[in-house]
């Protein structure tokens, strides 16, 4: 729980059975499967592997460290990842926190990791609880988060 990793393109990775993750990634319609755990599709056929294509895309550099050390701070946004494709922060709300998006030319996505809260903006509000995801449109300049919750905050910078 609460582990964070930044796995750049070209790094072979796998997700084990029973793991729940938030996989935030750049826009892409490409996945190269080098192994598929002997799974089959809805017709009982093995899914296609892309081993030859993958070899050209894999980063074989040794000693790559992907884990992100972070310590959430109450009513603050703590950066986890900032890259050319997206920014991801963790936000722990206790009580009330106002977030300004005026300098941001992007939507914001909040994923509720724990707890529940109410998101309030000039023309409305929305409640969210653990496991839910909320898309905040780019036209909202400011939002107040009220409650007790831990969130992922994702946007394009």
Predicted regions and their residues:
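Short acidic-glycine-tyrosine-enriched beta hairpin
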Residues: 1-6, 121-140
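Conserved hydrophobic/aromatic beta-strand scaffold that supports enzyme active sites
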Residues: 4-6, 12, 21-23, 88-90, ...
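C-terminal amphipathic alpha-helical segment
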Residues: 32-104
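Non-heme Fe(II)/2-oxoglutarate
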Residues: 17-20, 26-44, 110, 131, ...
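Ligand-binding loop in jelly-roll beta-barrel domains
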Residues: 10-30, 138-157
